[in-house]
Amino acid sequence: MPTINQLIRKGREKKVRKSTAPALKCNPQKRGVCTRVYTTTPKKPNSALRKVARVRLTNGIVVTSYIPGVGHNLQEHSVVLIRGGRVKDLPGVRYHIVRGALDLAGVKDRKQGRSKYGAKRPK
């Protein structure tokens, strides 16, 4: 516990909060080009083939990002929109690709939670 004199001399130091998505550089989303589209396996208790892509952003940073939803039309040189948000069971994946934006199509036949997967309202 500091004395009043110590507080006058030094003051309290503000805690600096580290960003969870540093490659976005304080932007809500960033555009990028896919350099590699592949599947990975998740961490220990889970088992699957998760779809991910290596993306070179417009600021030159290369990140690994997750492709949400069932099925996708991404390939090398596809232009995508990246948002923050990590995938808990994939180490090193701290970004999501936005469905229904730029080259990535929305999820087909999606009935619920459509806005998160870029699906239009079914007729």
Swiss-Prot record:
The UniProt keywords, alphabetically, are: Methylation, Ribonucleoprotein, Ribosomal protein, RNA-binding, rRNA-binding, tRNA-binding
Molecular function terms, GO-annotated: rRNA binding; structural constituent of ribosome; tRNA binding
Give GO cellular component annotations, separated by semicolons: small ribosomal subunit
SUPFAM superfamilies linked to this entry: Nucleic acid-binding proteins
Segments crossing the lipid bilayer: none
Q: Which residues carry this modification: 3-methylthioaspartic acid?
A: D89
Which biological process annotations from GO are given for this protein? translation
Q: Which domain of life is it from?
A: Bacteria
Q: Signal sequence: where?
A: none
Q: What InterPro entries has UniProt attached to this entry? A: NA-bd_OB-fold, Ribosomal_uS12, Ribosomal_uS12_bac
Physiological role? With S4 and S5 plays an important role in translational accuracy.
Q: Subunit info?
A: Part of the 30S ribosomal subunit. Contacts proteins S8 and S17. May interact with IF1 in the 30S initiation complex.
Q: What protein am I looking at?
A: Small ribosomal subunit protein uS12
Q: Source species, please? A: Syntrophotalea carbinolica (strain DSM 2380 / NBRC 103641 / GraBd1)
